[in-house]
Amino acid sequence: MAAISSTLLSLLSKGDHIVTSADIYGGTYGLMTSYFPRFGIDVTMADIRDPSSFEAAINENTKLLYVETITNPVLKVCDLDAMASLAKTHGLISVVDNTFATPWACRPISMGFDLVIHSGTKFLNGHTDLTAGIVVGRADLIKGAFDAKTKLGGSADPQMCYLLERGMRTLHARMPIHTSNSSEIARRLEGHSAIVSVNHPSLPSFADYEVAKRIAPKGTGMLSFAVKGGDESAMRFIRALEIIFEATSLGGIESLVTCPFNTSHMFVPEEVRLEAGIIPGFVRMSIGI
């Protein structure tokens, strides 16, 4: 969140407008809906699956488009080519959180994005033993983010940097296993009598299957699904697991599971969660190696 807040606050001022989607990570949603209005920054939520809805939301004060490559936790896949083109057409800065895809599966800068943000805590590190954020992209924009990071206190300590560098050395070895395992579990869950729906880019039944083949063809180590019986059934399911641990975070070598309604998206209003696809019984899994 330090990387996200430092980057966005370095680019936005009172009176500016940003277009994003309600499907984003709960912490980012909170930043944009709770803090940005206090700073006089307007935010419009559009449909991540419909670039034309982003274009319709643009006004004379719009400064920036913000999306996630693969959304947390519903795993909707953004058409980054279309979004980058839209931003360039309207002279806007384009920013994408690429955490769920990682640089192994998707390179948004090559698609035309100005800035790419990663949670270093997750797959880049891969060992669940640090918290970090990364932003890469245009040098002129990075300079402002670096200055904001310094002034806002989001600086990384040397030990954390060492651990992150260590983890990134094995990213390309780990990710094929993460994605293969998550694809297999998604396949087995699909059609199970206790499951309402499964979200994973590898499934032909998934709404963004075709977009995913173009944007992030290697996939992701994440998956999500809904259990019949609502949130209580989902919690019983989670607590009956013996190998997969109930815990927040994701992207480590171990497998973790949570219910977003009481973790990552607990402060997102229920109606917003439902509209985003976080229905009763919704479960998010990070599949390890």
Regions found by a protein language model. Name each.
Residues I195-V283, I287:
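Conserved C-terminal alpha-helix-loop-beta "cap" of PLP-dependent enzymes
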Residues M1-A194, N199, E210:
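Conserved PLP-enzyme active-site core in the AAT-like
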